[in-house]
Amino acid sequence: MKDNTQVFESYSVPRAVRTLALPSMMGMLVNIVYNLADTFFVGQTGNANMVAAVSVTMPLFLLFIACGNLFGVGGCAFVSRSLGEGKTERVKTISSFCVYSAIGVGLVMTVLFLVFRKPVLYAVGASDATFAYAADYLKYVAIGSPFIVSSVMLGNLVRGEGAARVSMIGSIIGQVVNIVLDPIFILNKGDKLFGLTMPFGTGQGVAGAAIATVIGNVVSVVFFLIYFLRGKSILSISPGRYRVRGGIARGVITVGLPAAINSLLMSISNMLINVFLQAYGDNAVAAMGITMKANMLVVMLQLGLAQGVQPLVGYCYGANKLDRMRHSIRFSCVCNIVLGTVITVIYFIFTRQVVSVFIDDPAVIDYGVKMLRALMISGPVIGCMFVLNFSFQGMGKGTQSMILSLSRQGLIYFPLLIIMNKTVGLDGIIWSQAVADLVCTAMSVVMFLLVVRKLRRQHSQKTEA
């Protein structure tokens, strides 16, 4: 069994953050490509209804991701805290709970989506023209649901014991397999791709995209299982260690639920902003879609760094090494602020060129330039909020994490979007996310200072006793 906890215990803070964050950030970069792959390759068929079908089913796919985050992010935080407390037996119970709960939830979702496929798809926006394609996509993705949920869960869970590199490799392997298989299953033999003729292809269209996605996740799960079976991990996949009581389920779900809700709210907020933008024409909708893709680079990189440092915070909190924990959080915030500032400056200088990468329509580009600059206003500081939110998760502070998750994409953002649209119009829609991000960043700093003050008071009371 390999001891990965030395990165938490003995590495300097900069080295520990680098060791944990870089693999997570690399995984996020590949994830950006992965998120665009299905839409890109389905788009090569020239069938707009197939492309629309993939978009329609995206909220349902994000539901699988949310369930994976429920057990993965929650399990990661609970595992790292338990390791810091020296409770290795509890770590094995936590990991077993997460593994088999994820499989169970995945199986339930398989049954539900296969049985209620038609009403579910029409509820999320399928039309008569797109239903058949969306139904094909959902059928295969639903069958693979246990693997999709488990892949997301395992990629997060192993980070809890410091195996950031293993998490990165397992996730990237699955994503690369998906990207490689996409054109093979989607396109026909003889179709053109990047100016070249496809030497083979099954021509299954949108169903092929779903099959490639499932196979990629199966490969990822197999990789993690091999990691466990080779005795490289302190985590356990033994069904005999599965427990719900003893604070196990509560400890996982308290932290995992905010992460799951955040995934769902991101999907809902994207749908809502498109509904508002429809009043201003298709060019505005297209420009916002492009802006979101461009903004994905800074958000994913900053999320990757924040996600990487979460188990370090959890371990230090569990081991009562509060000075090291605060140092780790401060250093990570500074790194994200520098990263966000650099990318923001580059985007402001080359805004038109960035938007033009995605489209050559002048009207859409004009909208996109305005939208990207507005969205990037929060770029330098939003990474600080990500670090603090993941730090709350690492410390097991589910309430604070829940407040931030609900606020950024819900409680603050939705009212702002509605009010600013009514009072300012299109500019209000464009600026609403940046304003919400700035407000939530300020909230996260205040909440963190309150948590630190409480921890100091508790520590001084223990010292006096």
Where are these regions (language model features)?
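Short runs within selected transmembrane alpha-helices of multi-pass transporters and secretion channels
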Residues: 141-159, 167-175, 209-222, 306, ...
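Helix-terminus/linker motif at the lipid-water interface of multi-pass membrane proteins
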Residues: 29, 33-51, 121-128, 184-189, ...
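Interfacial/gating helices of multi-pass transporter permease domains
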Residues: 42-62, 128-136, 206-207, 248-255, ...
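Short alpha-helical transmembrane segments in multi-pass integral membrane proteins
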Residues: 1-21, 79-146, 193-257, 313-378, ...
